[in-house]
Amino acid sequence: MELIETDVLVVGAGPAGLTASALLARSGVNAIGITKYGGTADSPRAHITNQRTVEVLRDLGVEGLLRESAMPQDIMGTQIFATSFAGLELSRTTAWGAGIDRKTDYERASPSAMCNISQHKLEPIILEAARRHGAEIRFNAELIDLHQDQTGVTARIRDRSSNNEYDIRCKYLIGADGGRSLVASNIGFDFEGEFNIGEAISVWLDVDLTKFTAHRSGAIAFIAPQSSDIWMSIWPCVAPWTEWNPFFFRHGWAPGSTDEKVLQGYIREAIGDPDVAFKIKKITPWQVNHVVARRYRIGRVFLAGDAAHRHSPANGLGSNTSIQDSYNLAWKLASVLSGGANDSLLDTYSEERQPVGRQVVNRAMKSHVEIEPWSEAAGLRAGMTEGDARTNLAELFGDSVRGEQRRKALLAGVDLMDYQFNAHGVELGQRYRSSAIPLAEPFPEYTRDRELYFQPSTVPGSHLPHVWVRRNEERVSTLDLIDYVGFTLLTGIGGNAWNEAARAVAAELSVPIKTARLGLRQEFDDLLGDWTKIREVSDRGCLLVRPDRFIAWRNSGLPSDPTGELRRVMLSLLGRGTAPA
């Protein structure tokens, strides 16, 4: 039987797997990506793409391609709640930073605006990045078995186009093979939470809803019908305003049920105008889960993406978390495989990302449940008669004590959903604690709601804050100063000794450390003073930034032996022990 050898095998070619393949190739790692499917996603699926994820795609050089295909942030921001598109609109709110009270928060946080792009459009863009960097991706290549030993992992692969089987032997394997992960089940990863807590069906449609939506443009519409056996339908927009991918929740729905006539009835009811024609392109049943792997590493095998965390689509966190898993893991694998770091560095992947996965799973489930108070206040529930719905709506709009109470409850329900639509802190505010963050300091207390608001900091374990600086009159983000194939030391006006230390330590340890000097009339000119205000170290201090743009360490000043100090930190971070004092 044919045996192929590689350093890393990536199982799965969704958002997590393709991103891992692209980043590994960019880092010079010999890797192979496989998927049993014949191509990228064939339906919309995930769609909200937050700023951290766009930053990853920016780093991969494909942000421009993303913008060409995506629905931009400036037409994403109106969320409507109505009995149908043509019917009564009961509530409206702003989302994804579109509100006047949140717009500046989002603009200050990142050089990259978020966007709405369905998965079947996003995956080819990441695939383009992967191939541009030389990644090998094999379609129609199905994992059928795997086992690991002390020195590596052997995977049995079936070529689905020829039915031939062959083995791939790798040093490490990434299981990014989705919610039914064979890697997770075969290796024995344990999960916490609850599987299959609800059923839903997505229906990808061609339907022109321009006259109902162009004047109140948004990425998602919520439709609560006046008479139906479904609770609510949620309508993500795939292409403004003629392509949609609604999903329908119904209690007790049989798994796999795809009765097209029933679905056509739900769709007509949600549109509310019998003259609007539509065409069903694809029907996809799925389950709502609330689970996360207890650890993301067992031996030489790692989980990433939906293989590690599975949850409600609320908050739009799924593909974002998946891509960011890979952004955390790939540089660590590259560091270990190049000999720059000890294998123990790979333990920090689970230490850092598993708590993020747990937070995301819990937040998504909480947001899923937090739709119900609005529905209850609106008086629209699954299974009610049209007469009951009319009575409830008449009371809601009426001049009565009960009507006023319900209107207040309706507003409160919309406000509660801010934790789904404007959860900027959940999207951007990850804080890491692991051995890859040496000499950890206490994180600052949150000054605002930690889920709704992102609070930038340079405390180690925080993501590097974005501000604009200038180089030769060109505006540059601080995030663009970071190199994914190495570490970056950010210094100031008094940082020459740190720059020399970085060169010496990089040469001694054979680990790339680039430098960038920021400040007034420095290499990167801080004319506005925004960097000086946020850096939290002096002109003679420094920040050591990891390839994934998280701050590994900082020093507020200049010690007597900056080279020795930096050497000790790097050796500790890389799991190579400590140098003599």
Regions found by a protein language model. Give the residues of each.
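Beta1/beta-strand and adjacent pyrophosphate-binding region of the FAD-binding site
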Residues: 2-16
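Glycine-rich FAD pyrophosphate-binding loop
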Residues: 25-45
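Active-site-adjacent segment of FAD-dependent monooxygenases/related oxidoreductases
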Residues: 45-131
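Conserved FAD-binding catalytic core of PHBH/FMO-like flavoproteins
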Residues: 128, 172, 176-288
